[in-house]
Amino acid sequence: MALRLVTHFDVLEDVLPSLLTQAATTDEGDRAGVLETTYGSLRVLNIERNGNIIYTYKDNKGNAVFGLYDCQTRQNEHLYTFEKDMQAVSCSVNSERTVLAASFIQYTTEGVKNDLQPGSKCLTLLVEIHPVNNVKVLKAVDSCVWVQFLYPQAESHLLPQNHLLLISEEKYIERFHIQITREDGDRVVIRNSSHLPRDRLAEDFVWAQWDLSEQRLYYIELKESRSILKCIQFRADESFNLMFEMPLDITLTGLRFKLVNFGYDYRQDREKLCNQPSLCIFTNHTGSLCMCYSPKSDSREEITYSVFYLHKGYRKIFTAAPGSADSQVTNGADSQVTDGIAFLNLGYFVAVYSPGHFLHLLNIQHPDLVCHSLFLTGNNKIAAVLPPSPLQSLPGSLVLDCYSGKVYRVTLDQSYLLRFLWNAHLDCERMAALHCILSCSQDPGFPEEQIIQWISEHVSACHSFDLIQEFLIASSYWSVYAELDDMGMLLQYSSVLTWNTEIPGIKFTTEELPLPLMKVYGLKGYWAKLNSNLEYIKYTKPHLHYHNSVVRREWHNLISEERTGKRRSTMYVRNILENAMKVIASMETRTLEPRLIPFLQEEDRHQRLLMGLMVSELRDHLLRHLQGVEKKKIEQMVLDYISKLLDLIWCLLETSWRKHSMHPLVLHLNSHCSAADFEVFHLMTRILDAASSLCLPLPPGFHSLHTILGVHCLPLYSLLHYIDNGVLLLTETAVTRLMKDLDNSEKNEQLKFSIIVRLPPLIGQKVCRLWDHPMSSNIISRNHVARLLKNYRKEPRNSMIDKSSFPVEFLPLNYFIEILMGLESSNQALYGFEGHDNVDAEFVEEAALKHTTMLLGL
């Protein structure tokens, strides 16, 4: 199962034993009778902002009893006993646990609301419970009423008065102001309880949802056949604001009146519950705002639902084939209730769940491409974990099972997703599963090593996208994402820009939406982030995502200038190289264990330049758009991001290296090629291709190892083809190793010569003298002569040559050597260069004679 459920609260385990113990101490009758009565009536009524759970049950006298489970102390507390056999509909207690509000409704013995009995059907009470004292009747009406106390921002911040929301089935919402005083020490009394001030917050609404964590009220009004979504934010200073309103282009067919997160009425007519469409709103700390909607449908062939990404300005309408249902889930007495679908908030994802049919994990943080969401059908055995009964999503990734009274903490099951990743056959499945797992990178037990192993073994498995690119970009993104919420707008999330491949079992369409109209200015917290997202959608073209195009251009310019002898400002280049040193220092601290592959041990100036340029450009990019963030923090995030990227490349290679049990001796060219060598070489080639197309840096030493493995694995013509096309770079380290390790057999001579003639001049001059061979002397001589004659102008000279000063009488050679000696004596600086102090006209003459002798076979 892609979801993992951990029981956070179980009313039968956390409450029932305490109630039985209490009954035994008070001698309330036989234990079996108490157990039967309590067990049959015990249920969860409400969950408050601080996580405390309010429950109700019937005692052995049939009285309605309210209790509270403290999630911090894990203790139960009796709140109030209503000495009458009525069914509790709703209950809430203030943060000080001194005042309780509850609503009751009369039922017949069959458990159905009695609409024929005269008198008020619903009674709403306000009770002083510290100690139990006065009871105030708030409402006595024929329609249902729900109650909810507002909570301050912190438990220690006690308000001078309490505020109670009252939601009526007659489609209005009121807020009561309850002034509390203390008399005779700790005795709590409601002041002026007969005339409680109230505000009318909403009228003519058909749907409302309470966000208990953030103290927000969402509701939908019907105006002239239009559905208007609104939101009220209640603040710690007792004020409230209408934050936004937005027209919804949906027909709420069958939605007469529905509440979300105001408790759950277990005695509602099941057919009525089943015929209601599903609608709920989810937010998270990054400023996302999603509305999920599923109309009631009688179709058994397909299920349709919509997700309104209000923070993105569009909605997606999904149509899914139900898949093969699990008979254990769909059969039974509760089958009618499970016909609909449930939406569960998992933070960065929303789970869309149809019991026994499908589970969709929708990426709400980056919903643009459907390939970043995972779509599982009944064939994936998804029905094994989530219960078939109605589920109510709560903040903090909590879910209430409305029938069993259990509260679960729901997270993505990393083990399942990893197994799914190994067994997936479609690119869309691999992409989605990879992103689901990487979103858990900050969780304990994150299986990064197993993911890297899968990547290293499946580099060629995906055809719709480059797997290595996707892994590097997404993993580096998630490594720093938690530090700043705005990273989603500034850093690249995926290497894939478009996705046109169909996903089996799912169809979708995308429709643009008008953006929510914000009603408040000077926003803070979540609302500031939501507003920032909306401003980004309205005004940002193109997107602000960082890319390396500027770095690529500047890097190529620096390399070109070095080759042509031009130089930038010394301070500019020094700053770039210092940036690279900081990244390397950050990489070295990522692990204390010795590495198998000896990266970071050579200069590799080009990679250090690229590294330093990326640090500079990414830092400037973030500083431009994160002006309220400390510069030092941004600099550290940049170093973490780039060092993580380089470390992932290193880990990919080490995983493959370890898998094939390769020995460090592979770095010596006198050993023979093996299948393991070729596997690692192929992986390095794919990494190089992925990094080059994105202009990402590689660990210093990467190119040397890649070239050494290339010499091991490739025939000469293929090797030279790779070199000529820039796949293999001839670094000084790799060529030096080649000259030292290979003997002068005919095959190796051909290889060495082919390598030397392709070397840049500066490296070639250093490497040639390491090869004790006439061919090397010939190349050194040619380079020396070319330097001397570069600016040579022929001048009249004595045609007579002193033949006695030459070992061989060969006039063309003698004449040429004399010219060289004259040039050498006139300007020493022309031919002196590092490592070749002994190269002069004499050396050239000797090399020419040896080469001629060899050609003539003498």
UniProtKB/Swiss-Prot annotation:
Localisation per UniProt entry: Golgi apparatus, trans-Golgi network
One cellular-component annotation, GO: trans-Golgi network
CDD domains xrefs: GSAP
Protein name as annotated: Gamma-secretase-activating protein
Function field: Regulator of gamma-secretase activity, which specifically activates the production of amyloid-beta protein (amyloid-beta protein 40 and amyloid-beta protein 42), without affecting the cleavage of other gamma-secretase targets such has Notch. The gamma-secretase complex is an endoprotease complex that catalyzes the intramembrane cleavage of integral membrane proteins such as Notch receptors and APP (amyloid-beta precursor protein).
GO molecular function per UniProt: amyloid-beta binding
Subunit record text: Interacts with APP; specifically interacts with the CTF-alpha product of APP. Interacts with the gamma-secretase complex.
GO terms for biological process, alphabetical: positive regulation of amyloid-beta formation; regulation of proteolysis
Family the entry assigns: Belongs to the GSAP family.
Keywords of this entry: Golgi apparatus
Primary localization: Golgi
Modified how: The protein is first synthesized as a holoprotein form of 98 kDa and rapidly processed into the gamma-secretase-activating protein 16 kDa C-terminal form, which constitutes the predominant form.
Gene that encodes it: Gsap
Keyword Membrane: no
PANTHER family: GAMMA-SECRETASE-ACTIVATING PROTEIN
Pfam name, any one: GSAP-16
Superkingdom of this protein's organism: Eukaryota
